[in-house]
Amino acid sequence: MTEPWKRQENEETIFRTCAWSPPGCHPTGCGLQVHVKDGRVTKIEGDPDHPITKGSLCPRCLALTEYIYHPDRIIYPMRRAKEDRGQDKWERCSWDEATDLVANAAKEITAKYGAETIAVFGGTGREANNWYPQWANLVFGTPNSVYAQAGWSCYGPRMTNTAFMMGGGYPEIDYAAKFPDRYDDPRFVPPEVILLWGKEPLRSNPDGLYGHAIIEMMRMFGTKIICVDPRVTWLGTRAEEILQVLPGTDTALAMAFIYVLAHDDLVDHDFIEKWTYGYDELVERVQEMPPSRAAEICGVPEEQIWRAARMYGNAKPSSVAWGLATDESTNGAQLGMCLVALMAITGFLDAPGGTTLGMGDDQGNVVREGGSISADDKVDDATDSTLELALKHGIMTPETWFTKRIGVDKYPCVGQVLWTVQPDEFLKCLETDNPYKMHMAGFVSSNPIGTAIGAEPQRWWKSLKKLDFNFAVDLFMNPTIMACCDVILPVASTIEHDGMVVTHYGLNASFYGAQNKCVQVGECKSDVEIMIEVGKKTYPEFWNRFEDDEAYNNFHVFRSWLPWDQLRDNVVTMSNEPYYKYKEGKLRPDGQVGFPTQTGRVELYSYMYEKFGEDPLPYYEPAAYGPTTMPETMKNDYPFVLTTGARVQNYFHSEHKQVPSLRQITPWPEVDVNEEDAKRLGIEEGDWVEISSPYGAVRQKARVLATIKPGVVHCMHGFWYPEEEGSEPNLYGNWKSNINMLMPNSVNAKTGFGNTFKSMICNIKKVHELGGPNEPERVVLERSREAEFEVQETWRPVDGPVQDPIDYEKELVEH
């Protein structure tokens, strides 16, 4: 039975596959070897033949066996009466019954109120990003797919920067990730300097960047690091410069970097002359932000700004990695404009050792074209986007797409680049029934009232509960499902279904990885299988053509790359994309040289931002809730700046909290406090701390550190207590440590993007307990289980401290 992707050893079959999700993970596509005996996973290890990860794995993949066989996992369809929402009164049902309930509700609501009154939610960074717009457009015919994070504050703003300034794709540091022989490829030149701005890729491996590659290049080639972060991260301890910027002031610092490069003439005039537009206007604009002024705003020494910017400007080549700091701020678009400019004006954009560009994803083009779409634009189904298929087959009309999608009339910038609603406006719609009343929601690997993405989650809770019908596609019970849903459709994990993972969702593809099905657990089905089953009952004229998920994937997912059998056998197929694609006509759909923008150049002066009513050049604007913007009367009440969103390796946002080995690493939510601030407030390591803002208060345990900027606290996001009572009002302790309780909605930039996640005012004080029982009794599990499920305890707190083996921030290295 030996094939390229599986082999037999003794009594085991060993499968090679690439990880994505579920459980949650970014599309980094780490290589797995999954050992299976008698239909059950016995061991998971890294795949040494994977050209990027080379056998290494994060704790989440190593704990995948615990995850898929956890006794709390949902492995059968479940239903519950609407009047029992909020209570644990679920009953097992058949797949046919469950999909009938979903499809019949959708058809009835569409007939009575219109398909637009149905919404489909999706989570962040997961494979479900592929599916929830397809659920919306192709299964239900609604334009309203929802990513519920206030201000669409993850990846979308960066996509907008690249779309508006460069025409698309996604810029990423060069670590030879596209070449089969990696660092040995003669085209590759290692970066001399990497500028890490608001990013800790060792923990997050974000969106396709394999973070450990930075360590490889530091060790092999002497690559140097500049970190911009209010916290000294593990990479920060090894950086040449760590600029501990005050959260919310990054744009001022980035403008000062451009000022230094222009002042010292550390720019590539040939590239600027041939391939950029608006350089002179940009230089004129940054004259208002010399390093002396930026130092006062950012809390970074002026001489360090000069030194770090010169280090970046003198490096040949240099590369930029930008993180969530670009997205989760109301001034984030302007920060992104500056960082794209820093990539470009040094001349190392899509150059060896610089910042690579992707050739883009053709499904993104239809969204960027905005109002030019019609149902007759294309005739070949096999090359159509999700939206084009929905229009062509009469599942959705152009009028519905352009006039019924919530929030894009107020924020057309969001509607131009993305395929979803504007989330803050959608929440208002739920609350006010304006412009129309919503009646149904589906949650595809999404937990909007939970602890990961939804600001003011109590508002989402109250609004979603009142809908006529709700369903979820997920693996575990969570607060949203318990509070709001009527049907659960159990979805397969990454090693339980066939599929494909592409770095950066295809916007900058390093490789195409096969997700090869290794095992079957219970009655779980893949996202695609579930879509097909429901779709055949809502729009059979379109969906009946697909016998299985392979047929659909070959038709609509793999068509741009490789046939499934070839993708599966390769396991990893490197993209092998060249450098300097803009010189060879590989970025523009017309095949001409240059960039797919109005000018054919990198637009440092952005016509697209200008079109949508935003300044075409970057500018600094203080945070909406910050030390300089709050009223004097509030300054004593909220003397700290709160930032959140940093990753821990053992969790993905709100997932994995019930997995014993992962919970043991970080058993409690943690708030990072500077040691001087802690001493002044009488806070010691491990104390319970209450964090409050004008919007609410929650509790987390203190980590007292020298490595976080004084006056700044960082709070862990995504924490809940699945070992606690699930029924309302507790909802698994959803409200106790949920830092999103402190964040407002509708604090957006002119574009509709950004929020306060990276910069919010707060106060902290020592308290004596979490609140409620700190050590609840172990959940008694009395569920019917197949023999494959071994007896296993749900995690519960233990006495005494637990050592965190990956507590990098506590390790300081002196240079």
For each of these PLM feature ranges, what is it?
Residues 1-496, 583-585, 590-594, 598-600:
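Catalytic alpha/large subunits of respiratory electron-transfer oxidoreductases
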Residues 42, 341, 465-469, 477-499, ...:
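C-terminal, active-site-flanking charged/polar segments
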Residues 42, 268-269, 305, 319-320, ...:
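Acidic/polar loop patches that form or flank catalytic/metal-binding clefts of enzymes
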Residues 170, 517, 521, 527-572, ...:
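Long, contiguous, secondary-structure-rich segments that constitute the structural scaffold
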Residues 177-182, 187-190, 381-404, 496-524, ...:
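Extended, charge-rich low-complexity interaction segments
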Residues 229, 309, 322-326, 359-360, ...:
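Active-site proximal loops enriched in glycine and acidic residues that flank catalytic Cys/His/Asp
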Residues 368-375, 382-384, 395, 401-412, ...:
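Long, low-complexity segments enriched in small/aliphatic residues
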Residues 430-431, 435-441, 445-450, 462, ...:
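C-terminal substrate/ligand-recognition segments
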